Amino acid sequence: LSQVLDAKVEGGEVRLDMVAREQVCRADFIGRDLVIVLGGDGTLTSISHNIDSTTPVMGVNSHPREMDPDGSFGFFMDSEVSTFRENLEAVLNGEAIENALPRLQATITSTSGNRIVSDPALNDLLIANTHQYAPSKYRVQRGDMDLKQLSSGILFSTFV
């Protein structure tokens, strides 16, 4: 991958900034034309919280199961190290197929009236008490529906 990307940078085709997953913040993705995520599904889902819905993301599975049974399934990763060069060319030439994936986002209004907006979630969104042992009291409202609950929390999932 680094050879392919270095050649694109040297040829003036792209500008490249690399950031480790542990150091990523929203500001890293402002004004980007493309974000390339190298890793597995967990890497992509954690990074996706910081990327707005208009920025294309190219997932590259760095450790596919075809090479190692303990590798990543790569459900969200449409590219692999072996196909990266041609996949990147397709993206840069506007020939790649874009898949728009739904994301969940919650707005939580506390009893004191404070509004908290969650990060966008690619597949699951868990709302629960910060203390795992404590139950959560909450109301779920949508349209005319208004449900009061007391439980461990609530889990929302996309169909993906």
Where is each model-derived feature located?
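Short glycine/serine/threonine-rich phosphate/pyrophosphate-binding segments
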Residues: 42-48, 148
